[in-house]
Every structure is written in structure tokens, then in C-alpha cells.
Amino acid sequence: MNIGLFVPCFIDQLHPPAAIATLRLLEHYGHSVAYPESQVCCGQPVINAGQSDIAEYAARFETSFEQYDAIVCPSASCVATIRHLYPQLTSRCAAVVEKTYELCEFLVDKLAVASVPGRCGDRIAVHQSCHGLRELRLG
């Protein structure tokens, strides 16, 4: 499968290793993963700051990702913005919105991954995000 990796702006700026780990994980399962350099923020920070017009973000998302079989993002907040707000802005985004997934959702629901190989000597805590639980109905 040809996957477009949508990297949230906060990961891009504050924790790039998370984006690299996401790419490697998807490649581990045998998929071709690309990072379209034309991608921009989903627009959620702009909305949170009070601006409601994010049509430009939706249009840019559509042109950046239309050629991929799936779009995977390691952020439920960004995916919720894309799924719930973009269709209200333009009907052109429908095709890309339908193939946009939060990372864990993609692994479990699309790839049927039951466990991830590897070991970690530390304890790991999992945070079920509010947007993942409430807006995407994950978990």
C-alpha cells in the first residue's frame, strides 16, 4: 500500500523522532511510506485561536495527499479536524477524508495488527486521547 504520512505540526516542531518512528513502523509492515513536503498544518491551532476559515488548509491537504492509498497521522486531534471539519468546507476533500486514519486505528482496523514485535525494558503508559475517544470513537 502506498501511504502518505501526515505529520502534525507539533510533532514536526517538538518531537520529530515520533514522525520517524511512525514511518519506520508502517514500513515494517511492508508499506511504501512518503512524506509529502507540500503538507501543512491541519488548521486546528488556527481554529483554537478563534479563526474559523480553514478552507485553505483543506485544499492544501487534498492536493498533498490525493495520490495515496491511505493517509496516516499519529494524532487523533488532527484526524478529527480533517474528518469533521474538512467535509463542511469543500466536497473535493471527501475522497482524501475517507482514507485518512489515526495511526493506531490504521494498525488495528486496516492492517489487523494484534501486537507489535519488540521489547522494552521500561514500563509504558498509554494515553487514550480525548479526541480519539470522543470524536473518532477509538478505544
What are these regions (language model features)?
Residues M1-G139:
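Iron-sulfur cluster-binding electron-transfer modules in prokaryotic oxidoreductases
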